[in-house]
C-alpha cells in the first residue's frame, strides 16, 4: 500500500498540474482580453487620428487655395502697376510726338476733314497757334480754338449744334492702342 506521504505527494502533483493548466488557460484568456482591448483602443484612436489628419489636410488645402488666390491677386496687381507705368511713361512721351512734322500733317488732315461751322477746337497750349494758323491757311471761319490743359497733344472738336464731341487727342488714341497691346506689353515685361 501506499503510504500517506506518497499519496499526499501524488495528490499535490495532480492538483499542481490542474492549477498550472488553469493558470495557463487564465493567462491565455487574459492575453486574449488584453489583445482585444488593445486592438479596440488602437482601432478607435487610429480612426480619430485619421479624422484629425483629414480635417487638417482639408484646412491646409483651403488655406493653400486661399493663399494661391491672394498670391495671384498680388502678382496681377504688381503686373498691372508695371503695365500702367509703361502707359504713363508713354503718355509722358506724347509731347515729343507733338513736335514732329507727321503729327502736324495729321492734325491738319483731321481739322480739314472734321471741322464744320460753329465748331470749337480744344487743344494744348503748345498747339493753339499752330491750329489757328491751319484755320487761317485753310480759310476755315467761324471756328473757335480753346486751350484745354488736360490735352498733351491732338484735338477735341465740339459741335454745339449736335452736342457732340469728337476726341482726337493723343491720350485717347494711346488708350485705344494700349488696350489692344496690353497683353503684348505684359508679355514683353514679364515673359508670359
Curated annotation (Swiss-Prot):
Main location: membrane
GO CC term (a single one): proton-transporting two-sector ATPase complex, catalytic domain
Membrane topology category: Peripheral membrane protein
Top-rank taxon, per record: Archaea
GO molecular function (one): proton-transporting ATP synthase activity, rotational mechanism
GO biological process: proton motive force-driven plasma membrane ATP synthesis
Localisation: Cell membrane
HAMAP family: ATP_synth_E_arch
Sequence similarity: Belongs to the V-ATPase E subunit family.
Protein's UniProt name: A-type ATP synthase subunit E
Organism of this sequence: Sulfolobus acidocaldarius (strain ATCC 33909 / DSM 639 / JCM 8929 / NBRC 15157 / NCIMB 11770)
Highest classification ranks of the organism: Archaea, Thermoproteota, Thermoprotei, Sulfolobales, Sulfolobaceae
